[in-house]
């Protein structure tokens, strides 16, 4: 599985990569972006990843601004230090919402949840007008 990591803090990025490699060594990191602008450009210039891990507070604004700029169907696992954005996250493409510091069991649970959804299920889930929360 190839993933995009949207994270502007080096330590948080490295921690996430370390955990991903421990939990699912077959994961390929397709890219790492640090800002809304960089993420939009990356998504317009590359094949869609299968899953995105996305911080909310980025160097040039909120990750939710990405959804105002491009249509995005890729499922997202939000990673943030703030719990106040959970409802907004599930109004977009979120399949999970992890609070920092992220732990191995958090990533394992998020990947298990992703694995239980096939592509059609994901598209159907993401097309719901107001998902109530995590599966």
Model feature map: region roles:
Residues 17, 32-51:
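Acidic, metal-coordinating helix/loop segments flanking the phosphotransfer/catalytic sites
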Residues 64-73:
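Short amphipathic alpha-helix used as the core "switch/output" element in two-component signaling
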Residues 55:
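Active-site residues of response regulator receiver
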């Amino acid at each position: 599985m190839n993933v995009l990591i949207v994270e502007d803090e080096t330590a948080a990025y490295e921690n996430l990569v370390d955990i991903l490699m421990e939990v699912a060594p077959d994961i390929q990191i397709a890219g790492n972006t640090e800002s809304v602008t960089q993420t939009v450009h990356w998504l317009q210039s590359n094949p869609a990843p299968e899953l995105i891990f996305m911080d909310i507070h980025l160097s040039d604004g909120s990750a939710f601004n990405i959804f105002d700029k491009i249509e995005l169907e890729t499922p997202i696992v939000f990673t943030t230090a703030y719990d106040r954005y959970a409802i907004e996250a599930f109004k977009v493409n979120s399949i999970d919402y992890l609070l920092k510091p992220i732990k191995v069991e958090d990533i394992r649970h998020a990947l298990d949840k992703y694995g239980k959804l096939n592509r059609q299920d994901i598209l159907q889930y993401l097309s719901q007008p107001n998902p109530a929360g995590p599966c």
